[in-house]
Design a protein with these regions (language model features):
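Function-determining sites in protein domains
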Residues: 19-202
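Bacterial Sec-dependent N-terminal signal peptides
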Residues: 1-29
């Protein structure tokens, strides 16, 4: 069977250095993690690190060959949490979905997972079509929402979508809070389309 690799994915892997030098050479990981004005790292980044450790997931900050995408969904007023992982490795896409319940401690800013369900997922349209659409919406390159010029988020509650991108030489983390409220910005509109695509496919 002939394997067709999307051109967009090939370009991402080349740009990110995923097909780089010998495995004997340790690659320095370029990290992009948003911070607040005082230099403190994003709270959602801290919370995701906590959940990542509890779920015993690989730390993408250490690099991943070839590409892994994680979309963490955080609901502010309920204890539900969700995670979609899409992984491209050895010329093959795979997906996993996690449903979680978590206790939030506002005193020490921690989350403790109390319940977890995990299942393998496959898109209805197939991995080639789904991954092409996902990459065309620039999921690997979207900026952090707070960095979008002219966008002011005055909402205090609501769902936040946190994205981790891991390649052999790059790690990115970015967040979108209620992107459907800011669709006049193409970046937020793309995030809305990404979420719509995932809902339709899974």
């Amino acid at each position: 069977m002939k394997i067709v690799i999307p051109i967009k994915l090939i370009l991402i892997l080349i740009i990110c250095g995923c097909n780089g030098q010998s495995k004997q050479i340790e690659t320095e990981i370029k990290k992009e993690i948003p911070t607040w004005n005082d230099g403190e790292v994003d709270l959602f980044y801290k919370l995701i690190k906590q959940k990542r450790e509890q779920l015993k997931l690989r730390d993408l900050e250490e690099g991943f060959d070839s590409l892994q995408i994680r979309i963490w969904i955080d609901y502010s007023l309920i204890d539900f949490r969700e995670l979609y992982t899409f992984e491209y490795q050895n010329n093959k896409w795979t997906g996993v979905y996690y449903f979680m319940r978590a206790d939030w401690n506002s005193n020490d800013l921690t989350e403790t997972i109390t319940e977890t369900e995990r299942k393998i997922i496959n898109p209805k349209s197939g991995w080639t079509d789904f991954s092409n659409k996902l990459l065309e919406l620039e999921i690997t390159a979207l900026p952090n929402m707070r960095d979008i010029e002219g966008l002011v988020d005055g909402w205090t509650d609501g769902t936040t979508y946190n994205v981790e991108i891991g390649t052999k030489s790059n790690y990115r983390f970015y967040s979108y809070h209620l992107p459907d409220k800011f669709t006049e910005f193409w970046q937020a509109q793309n995030m809305v389309e990404i979420l719509k695509l995932i809902e339709e496919e899974f």
